[in-house]
Structures are given as structure tokens and as C-alpha cells.
Design a protein with these regions (language model features):
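Short beta->alpha transition motifs characteristic of CBS
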Residues: 30, 37, 89, 99-105, ...
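Short beta-strand scaffold segments in enzyme catalytic cores
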Residues: 65-67, 86-90, 123-125, 214-216, ...
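CN hydrolase (nitrilase-like) catalytic-core segments centered on the catalytic cysteine
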Residues: 45-64, 140-234
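Active-site catalytic loop in hydrolytic enzyme cores
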Residues: 54, 73-152, 165-175, 179, ...
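Short, basic/aromatic-enriched C-terminal tail that caps enzymatic domains
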Residues: 235-257
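Short, acidic/polar
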Residues: 2-12, 141-147
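Short hydrophobic-aromatic micro-motifs
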Residues: 22, 131-136, 158, 188-189
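Cys-nucleophile CN-hydrolase/nitrilase-fold catalytic domain and related Cys-dependent amidase chemistry
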Residues: 5-92, 98, 164-186
């Protein structure tokens, strides 16, 4: 698909510039308005995930990218609905897994749970000497998930996102990404789908189709990098020692036994 080819090209570009962990947005495989999700959903053994994983293996990097996997079938209002999981694919050398979004986006007159089965499990993985936790989009409104990931050892939390635009939504996004970094004393790497229509549509209600403004926030809530409404690639050096230092001076996270 076109999305897949764009994703592969961006991964290759980022890896060529030295990236070790590459984070793409929620719904990288296809956006929420590209047709019925259940008709496009693929397993982790399907062509989208295996193409990402093959390139990650070749480049010796770890990639996180949003996709949809078949989940369950429910009956609602006399209709049979094949729901999907909103999955953050995690792919790298010898690694092929995923995190299923726990908090479905049932807000602002939208009900993701009608078509998406909520996940149940926290997920963390290693990249070099870094422990990375996973969350997706609406999860960022739930600080306990981020604190629990940090208590389990996560030093950085990735957040693939397709953040709906509208009045105040960019301000909320900026506040929430900084707040979750402070709550968890972790780096936050939040990759958002770019805004359809770019700056010209900024602030107009859009549904879950992206607001751009991908960002990297350090454990002290300082924004290290931020994109605009358009496509971009952000880079940052991640220092585990900065996490350790912050957690010594601001001990708000209790390590799990």
C-alpha cells in the first residue's frame, strides 16, 4: 500500500541518520477514514508487519508503528461487528510483537470501542540499554499507565498517535505529553499523524485524523523537539543517565518489587 511504502522510506531515512528506535504514528498502516478497519486489519504475520520487521532486521533498528489486527466479533443493535485491536507493532532484529491500546477513544462524540477491542496488558521492550514502554494516543490521558510502566523499569515511553484536531486540542496535547513525562520521570516520544490540510486547517474539528506536532519530551517535562502540522522526522539523543538523575531528585515513581 501507499502508506506502507511511505513508512518504509521514512524508516530507511531515519536509520540512515543514525536512529536506533524509530516511532511512527498510530494507524500507520491506514488511517481511520480509509475504509472499514475490519476489512483491512492484518495479523502480525501479515504483509504490513512482516515488511516493517524485515526492514528493521536489515537496518538493525527497532520500529514502532500503528496498525490494526483482527480481534473479536460482537452483536450490537442487531448487527454483527468484527472488531479489531488498535496495535502498536514492535519490530526489530529477532523481535515481532505488539501493544494493544488499552484505553479506547470514547470521547468527543466518538466511540472507538464500537469497532476496537481494548487491550488488557502493559508492554515494555528493550532497545540497546534502554527499557521502552508503549502507549497509544488516548492512553496519554491516563497517568497511571505511564507511572506503572515507569515503576516496571521503563525509561522512555512511546506514544503512536492520531490526535483529533479542534478547539484547544493542540494545547491539550502539549500539556499531556509534558505531564506524562513528569508523572513517570521518563522520556516521552509521541509520534502523531500529520494534519490533513496542514496549517490551513489548524484548529478545525477533524475526527481522529491527526494534528501533527510529534514531540520528544525529557523526564523533566522539557520539550526536546517538536514538529508542526506537516510531515517531519524528529531526532533526539536519549540519555538513560538523565532518567536516573531525575528519579533521584524527583522520586515520584516507586520501583516494582
Amino acid at each position: 500500500t501507499e502508506n506502507q511504502e511511505i513508512a518504509l522510506a521514512k524508516i530507511r531515512e531515519a536509520a540512515g541518520n543514525g536512529a536506533r528506535l524509530i516511532v511512527l504514528p498510530e494507524a500507520t498502516s491506514q488511517n481511520f477514514r480509509s475504509g472499514r478497519l475490519d476489512e483491512q486489519a492484518q495479523s502480525l504475520e501479515g504483509p504490513f508487519a512482516t515488511a516493517i520487521q524485515a526492514l528493521a532486521e536489515e537496518l538493525e533498528v527497532t520500529v514502532v508503528a500503528g496498525m490494526f489486527c483482527p480481534a473479536d466479533t460482537v452483536e450490537r443493535d442487531g448487527k454483527t461487528i468484527n472488531r479489531v485491536s488498535n496495535t502498536a507493532l514492535i519490530a526489530g532484529p529477532g523481535v515481532l510483537g505488539g501493544y494493544d491500546k488499552i484505553h479506547t477513544y470514547d470521547a468527543f462524540d466518538y466511540r472507538e470501542s464500537d469497532t476496537v477491542l481494548a487491550g488488557e496488558s502493559l508492554v515494555a521492550f528493550d532497545v540497546d540499554d534502554l527499557v521502552v514502554g508503549a502507549a497509544t494516543c488516548y492512553d496519554i490521558r491516563f497517568p497511571e499507565q505511564f507511572k506503572e510502566l515507569a515503576s516496571q523499569g521503563a525509561q522512555l515511553i512511546v506514544v503512536p498517535t492520531s490526535w483529533a484536531d479542534g478547539p484547544g486540542k493542540l494545547e491539550q496535547w502539549r500539556l499531556l505529553t509534558a505531564a506524562r513525562a513528569l508523572d513517570s520521570t521518563s522520556y516521552i516520544v509521541a509520534a502523531g499523524q500529520s494534519r490533513p490540510g496542514g496549517d490551513a486547517e489548524a484548529g478545525n474539528p477533524s475526527g481522529p485524523t491527526g494534528i501533527g506536532h510529534s514531540t520528544i519530551v525529557d523526564p523533566n517535562g522539557v520539550r526536546v523537539a517538536e514538529a508542526g502540522y506537516e510531515d517531519d522526522i524528529l531526532y533526539a539523543e536519549i540519555d538513560p543517565n538523565e532518567v536516573a538523575k531525575t528519579r533521584r531528585t524527583l522520586p515520584v515513581v516507586t520501583p516494582a518489587d
